[in-house]
Swiss-Prot record:
Residue window of motif LXXLL motif 1: 560-564
Regions of compositional bias (Low complexity) in chain numbering: 347-357
UniProt cross-references to PANTHER family, sorted A to Z: JMJC DOMAIN-CONTAINING HISTONE DEMETHYLATION PROTEIN, LYSINE-SPECIFIC DEMETHYLASE HAIRLESS
Cofactor(s) annotated in UniProt: Fe(2+)
GO cellular component: chromatin; histone deacetylase complex; nuclear body
Protein name per Swiss-Prot or TrEMBL: Lysine-specific demethylase hairless
Function: Histone demethylase that specifically demethylates both mono- and dimethylated 'Lys-9' of histone H3. May act as a transcription regulator controlling hair biology (via targeting of collagens), neural activity, and cell cycle.
Annotated SMART domains: JmjC (SM00558)
Keyword Cell membrane annotated: no
Annotated positions binding Fe cation: C999, E1001, H1117
Pfam families per the UniProt record, alphabetical: JmjC
Length: 1181
C-alpha cells in the first residue's frame, strides 16, 4: 500500500461529517451543549475530535501488539518536542493498520469556548494569558479507548481500539488482516492512568504529565495478563477464563491487596473483578451501528448491544435485552465467579425491546434519544469518571464503598457542568454541619457491627453521609429517578440525563415515588409503597398534595423547631455531665412515655438497658444529680423499681435517641429551605437551625467558631426593610444587647396581631420567665417551655379579637348579613372570608370551594356547623329500633357534677326514649344518658360513619391533616374511636339542665346528630321563645328541626371561665379540668353574668338531624338536648390545635392512662407529619 488511505489523510477534525447513524460532530457555528458526560466516553455520544500520533516501539503499548507503518502525518503547527514527547516522524515502518494514542487537538476540552481548533499555542481560560502558562497544550492524552479510522470508506467515526472478529469480513480487500483481534469487548491494552490532583474540583491546574502515570510494559501483555489474553481462533489473542493474573501496571512495591483496583481494565472502565464475556458470535448489525453502543454503568453489563435507551429520558442509547437474558453478552457464569450486580434485571420496564421491534426502529429511537452535544472541558473526564463512578456498588460481593466516594460526589454536585445542566446549585453554607463531611454521624449514632462489604454496612454508610448539595436525600437508591435504570446507588447522573430532566417534565418519578426519608422510623405508606428506614411510625396510605403539605408545614414547623431546640439543650447537658454519645434505638412495642412524669418522649431520653424504664430530659436531670452524689461517696441513691424488681441507679441509665441528631439536623435544614422556597409564614428565629448540630469527636457537640449572621427573612409583603422602619421609629435608645440583636434581625409580621404581640414583648423585659415565640429577647429557659406555647397563642388571638371588637364598636360582634344573636348566612359559603365574628356554616359535608375558608375559621379557634350529612347516612342503622338491641352504660347527669352510673339497663332506657310517660322516675334536676363505644359488633355503622364524615382530611382516621394518622404503629387509639351517645330531651321549663355539662376536650371533636325524636306540637311555641332569648352569637338553619343547642366559648377564655365557676359554683363543682367530664352547666342567667362581669361571651349553634358540629381542642362547650337525640362523637388531632392539645394533656391530671399515653405521642406525630410535608414540597416545582 503506497498511497495513504483516505481515512488517514490530514483532514481537519471539524470538517469531518458523519452518517445518520454515526457520530454527529460539532458543526461550525452551532451552539455547543455544555456539560461533560459524568461517565465513560461512550461511543454513542459526541466527543471532542482527536488527532492521532502513531505509536513507537517504546510507547505505552505492550510489545505483544502489532504496530502500524510509517505513514506521513502532518504535525500541527507549534507541536514540537514538549516534555519529552516525540514528533510524528519517529514512527517505525510496519505494515497494517496503526495503533494510535489519542492526542488533544481541540481547545474545547480544556478551555471551553466552542470554536475550531487553532494550530498554535493554546491559552487556557484559567491561565494568565501567556503561552508559556499552558505547558500541556497539544499534550498527548493517553486515551486508548478511541481510534480515528474508517471502515468501508465511510465517514470517520469512533470505534474501539480492539475490534471484534466479525468486523474483519467487512474490511476493504486491499487491507491486510494483520491487527490483533479482541475476542472480548472488555479487553484493555493500556496501562492504568493515575488520577492527578488537578482533576479535583476547584483546582486551577491541568493534567500535567507524570512519568509514573503511564509506565511502559515490561513484558508482553499476553504473558503478564495470562488470565486475560491469549491466542484466539480468529486473531492473535484470546480470552483465558480460567485465571486472572496480576495487573500489568502494578507499581513496584505494591501488592495486589494494598493497591487500588485497576481503574480502566475494561473498555468503559469497569472493574476487572467482574466476569468477562466474549463478543457475540455474529455481528449485531451494520458496522456503523456501533454508534449506538452503550453499557449501563449500573448493571455491570459488559456486552455492547444495540437499541434504544432504557427510558426515553436518557439521551444516551441503551442496550436492549435479548430474549435470552438481560444482556446479550452475559453468558452463564461459572460457579464461584462473582456475578454482576444485575440492577438492570430489577428495573420496572426491564431492558429489553419489544420482540417485534426491528433493528431500524431501535436505531431510530436511539438516534432520537441521543441529541448531539459537545464537551466543553476535559476536567473530570474518563480518568476521573472511570475511577469514581463505575466501581461496583456497595452491595457487590467483596466490594466495600470507598469513604472518599461521598466527598467526590459532593464535589461533582457543585461542578459547573452539572450546574449548567440543572440550574445553579444552591450555595453550600460554610460548615453547615462541621465535621459531618469527615466522620458523618458515627459520633452520634452507634452502628451495629456487620461484615465488611455487606449490604447493610453500605446502606448504613450511605444513610449517614449527610445532606448533599443542600438537599436532604428523601429516597433510597432504589427509589431514585428511573431515567437511568442502570444508575448505580450513590453515583451522580450524567449531565445529559440531568439536562433532560430539567427540560422535560417527567412524571414517572411521581407515579413510582414513595417519599423514602432517611429520617423515618416506621413504614410511611405512600402510594402503597412501604418505606421504612429506622422503624417506628405510621403514615397515610397515599402521598399528600402540595397544598396540604404547605398547610402542615406552616402549622407544625415552628413547633418542630422548638422541639429541636430542646433536643440540643438536652444533649448539651448530657455531655457536660459526662454522658457518652447517644445510642439510636427504637422499639415499636414500647410506648414513648416517661416512666416518672408520664410525659411524652420526643427523641433524647434515658432508658434502662434491661427493661422498659425510661426517663425524659427533666427527670433525667434529677437522675443526674443522684449520679453526682454517688460519685461523691454519698449513700443516698435514687432508684426506681422496674418489672424485674431491679433498682435504676443513675449510672445504669443509657442516653438514647429514637432518631439520630444528624437526621434531625438534615430535616431542620431542608424545612427552612422549603419555607423560603414556598414563602411559608413562620415564627422560627433559629435561622439556620442545623449549624449548631455539628457532631464532634467522640460525640461531643461543637459550637460554631464563627457566628454567621442569620439570613434575612422577608416580611409579609416581601419587603425586608419594613422591620427597619419600625426599628427606627422606636424611641427606646437604652436597649440591651439582646434587644439590639433582636431588633437587627428582620421580624416577620404575617398579621397585625403578631406584630403587636411581638412589640408587646418589650413590656415583659422585667419578667425573666416570660418569653414570646414571636420576638424572643432572651434565650428561653428550659423550665418554662410548657407555658410558653399556650401564652403565645392566647396573647396573639386576644390581641386580634380586641382589635376586631374595637373596629366593630359596642354591642354584639355581628357583621353584615347576620341577625342579632343569630349568625345566619344569607347565601351559601363564598370563597372570600366572612366578616369578623361570623361563624362558618358549611352546607356541604365535603365542600369543593370552602376548604380554605374552613381552615381560616378553624385556625381562629371557631366552631363550625356542617349540614347535608343525612344524604349519606343510612337511617336504618341509626334508628332506635336498630340500636335498641345493643347494650350500653346508662348514666345520670345533673346540673352540678359529672355523670354518674345507674342501675338501669339499656332496655329500660330505650323504652322511655320515645315515650316520656314510660321513662323511669328521676329527680327533677337530672337527665338520663346512654354511652356506648362503637366496636367490632358495629362494623356496618363504623363504615357508614367513615363514609359520611365531613372534611375527611381532618376528621377521618387516615386524613392527611389528622395527626392521628402519623402516630406510631401499635399505639392504641381508643380515645379517638367513635362513641355513641343517646340522651333524653330536656323540657323547656328546665333550661338549667343540659345533656353535656361544660367541659374542655384535649383533642378536637366532631359530633354528628344521627337521630332525633319528633318534636311535640307545644314545643314549637316554646322553641320560638327560646330562640328569641338566645344570647351571644348563634348559628342555625331556619325551618330545620332544631334538636340540640350548643354553647361554645373561646379557648383563651377558659381561665376566666374557670375562675368564674369557682365563684358561683359550690366547692368542687366548678372545676374545668381538661379531658374530665363536665361538672357544671351554665344556664342563661350564668351566661349573662359571665358576659357582663367578665366580658366572656359564647357562640350558640342550633343542631338539626344530619348536621355536625366541630369544636376545636381547648374550647369550653356544653350541650342541651331539646328532644331525645342520638349522636356520634369522634375525636381527631388537627395541626392548628396540636400545640394546645399537648399543653392540655399536661394539665389534665385525671386523664385515663390510655388517653394520656395517646396524647403523649403528639410530638412524634408532629415529627412524622413534618417529614412527609417536607418530602412532598421538596420535590414540588
Amino acid at each position: 500500500m503506497e498511497s495513504m488511505p483516505s481515512f488517514l489523510k490530514d483532514t481537519p477534525a471539524w470538517e469531518k461529517t458523519a452518517p445518520v447513524n454515526g457520530i454527529v460532530g460539532q458543526e461550525p457555528g452551532t451552539s455547543p451543549q455544555d456539560g461533560l458526560h459524568h461517565g465513560a466516553l461512550c461511543l454513542g455520544e459526541p466527543v471532542p475530535f482527536w488527532r492521532g500520533v502513531l505509536s513507537a516501539p517504546d510507547s505505552w503499548l505492550p510489545p505483544g501488539f502489532l504496530q502500524g507503518p510509517k505513514d506521513t502525518l502532518s504535525v500541527v503547527e507549534g507541536e514540537g518536542s514538549r516534555n519529552g514527547e516525540r514528533k510524528a516522524n519517529w514512527l517505525g515502518s510496519k505494515e497494517g493498520l496503526r495503533w494510535k494514542e489519542a492526542m488533544l487537538a481541540h481547545p474545547l476540552a480544556f478551555c471551553g469556548p466552542a470554536c475550531p481548533p487553532r494550530y498554535g499555542p493554546l491559552i487556557p481560560e484559567h491561565s494568565s494569558g501567556h503561552p508559556k502558562s499552558d505547558p500541556v497544550a497539544f499534550r498527548p492524552l493517553h486515551c486508548p479507548f478511541l481510534l480515528e479510522t474508517k471502515i468501508l470508506e465511510r465517514a470517520p467515526f469512533w470505534v474501539p481500539t480492539c475490534l471484534p472478529p466479525y468486523l474483519m469480513s467487512s474490511l476493504p480487500p486491499e487491507r491486510s488482516y494483520d491487527w490483533p483481534l479482541a475476542p472480548s469487548p472488555w479487553v484493555y491494552s493500556g496501562s492504568q492512568p493515575k488520577v492527578p490532583s488537578a482533576f479535583s474540583l476547584g483546582s486551577k491546574g491541568f493534567y500535567h504529565k507524570d512519568p509514573n502515570i503511564l509506565r511502559p510494559a515490561k513484558e508482553p501483555l499476553a504473558a503478564s495478563e495470562s488470565g486475560m489474553l491469549g491466542l484466539a481462533p480468529g486473531g492473535h489473542l484470546q480470552q483465558a477464563c480460567d485465571a486472572e493474573g496480576p495487573s500489568l501496571h502494578q507499581r513496584d512495591g505494591e501488592t495486589g491487596a494494598g493497591r487500588q483496583q485497576n481503574l480502566c481494565p475494561v473498555f468503559l472502565g469497569y472493574p476487572d473483578t467482574v466476569p468477562r464475556t466474549p463478543w457475540p458470535s455474529c455481528p449485531p448489525g451494520l458496522v456503523h451501528t456501533l454508534g449506538n453502543v452503550w453499557a449501563g454503568p449500573g448493571s455491570n453489563s459488559f456486552g455492547y448491544q444495540l437499541g434504544p435507551p432504557v427510558t426515553p429520558r436518557c439521551p444516551s442509547p441503551g442496550p436492549p435485552t435479548p430474549p435470552g437474558g438481560c444482556c446479550s453478552s452475559h453468558l452463564p457464569a461459572r460457579e464461584g465467579d462473582p456475578g454482576p450486580c444485575r440492577k438492570c434485571q430489577d428495573s420496572p420496564e426491564g431492558s429489553s425491546s419489544g420482540p417485534g421491534e426491528s433493528s431500524e426502529e431501535r436505531n431510530k429511537a436511539g438516534s432520537r434519544a441521543s441529541p448531539p452535544s459537545h464537551h466543553t472541558k476535559l476536567k473530570k473526564t474518563w480518568l476521573t469518571r472511570h475511577s469514581e463512578q463505575f466501581e461496583c456498588p456497595g452491595g457487590c460481593p467483596g466490594k466495600g464503598e470507598s469513604p472518599a466516594t461521598g466527598l467526590r460526589a459532593l464535589k461533582r454536585a457543585g461542578s459547573p457542568e452539572v450546574q449548567g445542566a440543572r440550574g445553579p446549585a444552591p450555595k453550600r453554607p460554610s460548615h453547615t454541619f462541621p465535621g459531618t463531611g469527615r466522620q458523618g454521624a458515627r459520633a452520634w449514632q452507634e452502628t451495629p457491627e456487620t461484615s465488611t462489604g455487606s449490604k447493610a454496612e453500605a446502606q448504613q454508610q450511605e444513610e449517614q453521609r449527610g445532606p448533599r448539595d443542600g438537599r436532604i436525600r428523601l429516597r433510597e437508591s432504589r427509589l431514585e429517578d428511573t431515567s437511568c435504570q442502570h444508575h448505580l446507588a450513590g453515583v451522580t447522573q450524567c449531565p445529559s440525563c440531568v439536562q433532560a430532566a430539567g427540560e422535560v417534565e417527567i412524571l414517572t418519578s411521581h407515579s413510582q415515588k414513595s417519599h423514602k426519608l432517611p429520617l423515618e422510623e416506621k413504614p410511611l405508606e405512600e402510594d402503597s409503597c412501604a418505606t421504612s428506614e429506622e422503624g417506628g411510625g405510621s403514615s397515610p396510605e397515599a402521598s399528600i398534595n402540595k397544598g396540604l403539605a404547605k398547610h402542615l408545614l406552616s402549622g407544625l414547623g415552628d413547633r418542630l423547631c422548638r422541639l429541636l431546640r430542646k433536643e440540643r439543650e438536652a444533649l448539651a447537658w448530657a455531655q457536660r455531665e459526662g454522658q457518652g454519645p447517644a445510642m439510636t434505638e427504637d422499639s415499636p412495642g414500647i410506648p414513648h412515655c416517661c416512666s416518672r412524669c408520664h410525659h411524652g418522649l420526643f427523641n433524647t431520653h434515658w432508658r434502662c438497658s434491661h427493661c422498659s424504664h425510661r426517663l425524659c430530659v427533666a427527670c433525667g436531670r434529677i437522675a443526674g444529680a443522684g449520679k453526682n452524689r454517688e460519685k461523691t461517696g454519698s449513700r443516698e441513691q435514687r432508684t426506681d423499681d422496674c418489672a424485674q424488681e431491679a433498682g435504676h441507679a443513675a449510672c445504669s441509665l443509657i442516653l438514647t435517641q429514637f432518631v439520630s441528631s444528624q437526621a434531625l439536623a438534615e430535616l431542620s435544614t431542608v424545612m427552612h429551605q422549603v419555607w423560603a422556597k414556598f414563602d411559608i409564614r413562620g415564627h422560627c428565629f433559629c435561622q439556620v437551625d442545623a449549624r449548631v448540630w455539628a457532631p464532634g469527636d467522640g460525640g461531643q457537640q461543637k459550637e460554631p467558631t464563627e457566628k454567621t449572621p442569620p439570613a434575612p427573612q422577608l416580611s409579609c409583603n416581601g419587603d425586608s426593610n419594613r422591620t427597619k422602619d419600625i426599628k427606627e421609629e422606636t424611641p427606646d435608645s437604652t436597649e440591651s444587647p439582646a434587644e439590639d440583636r433582636a431588633g437587627r434581625s428582620p421580624l416577620p409580621c404575617p398579621s397585625l396581631c403578631e406584630l403587636l404581640a411581638s412589640t408587646a414583648v418589650k413590656l415583659c423585659l422585667g419578667h425573666e420567665r416570660i418569653h414570646m415565640a414571636f420576638a424572643p429577647v432572651t434565650p428561653a429557659l428550659p423550665s418554662d417551655d410548657r407555658i410558653t406555647n399556650i401564652l403565645d397563642s392566647i396573647i396573639a388571638q386576644v390581641v386580634e379579637r380586641k382589635i376586631q371588637e374595637k373596629a366593630l364598636g359596642p354591642g354584639l360582634r355581628a357583621g353584615s348579613g347576620l341577625r342579632k344573636g343569630l349568625s345566619l348566612p344569607l347565601s351559601p359559603v363564598r370563597t372570600q372570608l366572612s366578616p369578623p365574628g361570623a361563624l362558618l356554616w358549611l352546607q356541604e359535608p365535603r365542600p369543593k370551594h370552602g376548604f380554605r375558608l374552613f381552615q381560616e375559621h378553624w385556625r381562629q379557634g371557631q366552631p363550625v356547623l356542617v349540614s347535608g350529612i343525612q344524604k349519606t347516612l343510612r337511617l336504618s342503622l341509626w334508628g332506635m329500633e336498630a340500636l335498641g338491641t345493643l347494650g350500653g352504660q346508662v348514666q345520670t347527669l345533673t346540673a352540678l357534677g359529672p355523670p354518674q352510673p345507674t342501675s338501669l339497663d339499656s332496655t329500660a332506657f330505650w323504652k322511655g326514649f320515645s315515650h316520656p310517660e314510660a321513662r323511669p322516675k328521676l329527680d327533677e334536676g337530672s337527665v338520663l344518658l346512654l354511652h356506648r363505644p362503637l366496636g367490632d359488633k358495629d362494623e356496618s355503622r363504623v363504615e357508614n360513619l367513615a363514609s359520611s364524615l365531613p372534611l375527611p382530611e381532618y376528621c377521618a382516621h387516615q386524613g392527611k391533616l389528622n395527626l392521628a394518622s402519623y402516630l406510631p404503629l401499635g399505639l392504641t387509639l381508643h380515645p379517638l374511636e367513635p362513641q355513641l351517645w343517646a340522651a333524653y330531651g330536656v323540657n323547656s321549663h328546665r333550661g338549667h339542665l343540659g345533656t353535656k355539662n361544660l367541659c374542655v376536650e384535649v383533642s378536637d371533636l366532631i359530633s354528628i346528630l344521627v337521630h332525633a325524636e319528633a318534636q311535640l306540637p307545644p314545643w314549637y311555641r316554646a322553641q320560638k321563645d327560646f330562640l328569641s332569648g338566645l344570647d351571644g352569637e348563634g348559628l342555625w338553619s331556619p325551618g330545620s328541626q332544631t334538636s340540640t343547642v350548643w354553647h361554645v366559648f373561646r379557648a383563651q377564655d377558659a381561665q376566666r371561665i374557670r375562675r368564674f365557676l369557682q365563684m358561683v359554683c359550690p366547692a368542687g363543682a366548678g372545676t374545668l379540668e381538661p379531658g374530665a367530664p363536665g361538672s357544671c352547666y351554665l344556664d342563661s342567667g350564668l351566661r349573662r353574668r359571665l358576659r357582663e362581669e367578665w366580658g366572656v361571651s359564647c357562640w350558640t349553634l342550633l343542631q338539626a338531624p344530619g348536621e355536625a358540629v366541630l369544636v376545636p381542642a381547648g374550647a369550653p362547650h356544653q350541650v342541651q338536648g331539646l328532644v331525645s337525640t342520638i349522636s356520634v362523637t369522634q375525636h381527631f388531632l388537627s395541626p392548628e390545635t396540636s400545640a394546645l392539645s399537648a399543653q392540655l394533656c399536661h394539665q389534665g391530671a385525671s386523664l385515663p392512662p390510655d388517653h394520656r399515653m395517646l396524647y403523649a405521642q403528639m410530638d412524634r406525630a408532629v415529627f412524622q407529619a413534618v417529614k412527609v410535608a417536607v418530602g412532598t414540597l421538596q420535590e414540588a416545582k
